[in-house]
Every structure is written in C-alpha cells, then in structure tokens.
Amino acid sequence: MDDQLNKDVASMREVLDQDLATSQPRMPEQPLLVAMCGLPGTGKSYFAAKLTEQVPFLILETDRLRKVLVEHPKYTTGEHRRVFRSCYQLIQYYLINGYSVLFDATNLNEEFRAYLYDIAEATGARLAVVHATAPQNTVRRRLKERKADRHANTFSDAGWLIYTRLAPVEEPVQRDHYKLDTSKDIAPVLDQVVEWARSSGQIKVD
C-alpha cells in the first residue's frame, strides 16, 4: 500500500475498531459480507440499520467514512475512488479476522461491485448483494426532507444534484441479488436477508 492509502486505512480503522466493542459482529461458522447498492436516497442505510438490529454486522458506511478522510466532501470521482480503495482493504481485513461486514455504499456499477465479488471469493465469505431502489419522486422528497432536517440521523450530504449526477452511471447487478423497493414494505426482503444471514449464507440469494 502507498503512504496515502496506509494513512487513510489507519484513520478509518481507528473509527471502526471502536464500533467492534458494541456491534460484536462475529458469526459462529464463517464471516458474511452484505453489500448494499443503490443511488442516494433509496434507503440503503435505513435497511442496513434494521438488518443489524437482528443480525450483528460491522457496518462500513462510505458516507460516514468519507468524512473521516475529507471534512467537506465534494463527491468527485477521485474522492470516491480514494474512499472506496480504503474500504476494500478494510473489508478484506475484517473478514479475514472473522468479522461479518455490511458495506453500505452506492456500488453503482459492476466495476466497483467486482472488487466485492473478488474479496468474498478470496476470503471465503458468503456474499449477499441488496439493491435498493425507490421512485424518483420519493427519493426527491426524502432528500429534500433530509436537507431541511439539520438533526437528521444521517452522515450523507448527497442531495438531488448528486442523485441526478450519479443516476446515469448506475448499472444492473449482474449476479443473483435481493431486490429492495423501499417505497414499499421492506419487511419481506429484510426477513429474507436475516434468514440468509442466520443460515450462515447457506440459503441461495435470489
């Protein structure tokens, strides 16, 4: 790793190691990797929070970790790659050390998701991809409400402008995955992912 990457990983790990004391995301048989993907405002973090209420995971949330590295994020391509590069290193590190990880990020195209596929294969971790979507009018309303609420429980600064900039680059998930429309009741998909996790990833993702 180069010096900048080493520094970034160390800064992020300092934050994440503090989380381990409370989340205790070790699994009885083998670690699991859940990868959220979807545009800003589609409810990824809400789903992740609900999932970890039932199954212990260490959450790597890029919106949170981005601010560990960059005080005022600009969401540029270079910044994006810097954050994700460190996250990939940390995901692999925690999986190798027996922790189950939930990666809460946009993961909009197969180029970025391919890193996660490779990490899961290299570490032997079972992988579940959850693709979150919502109608544009729903997302726009959520982002507007989030911007207006200074006390909103979120690390994300992404607004409608960021959404419209990212939407054209989103690609379909090429592997079996869970399809989550957060404008509807999330309970059925949540139950499926919980069941998958409790089976140590033995249940087929569909």
For each predicted feature, which ranges?
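Glycine-rich phosphate-binding loop used to anchor ATP phosphates in small-molecule kinases
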Residues: 81-127
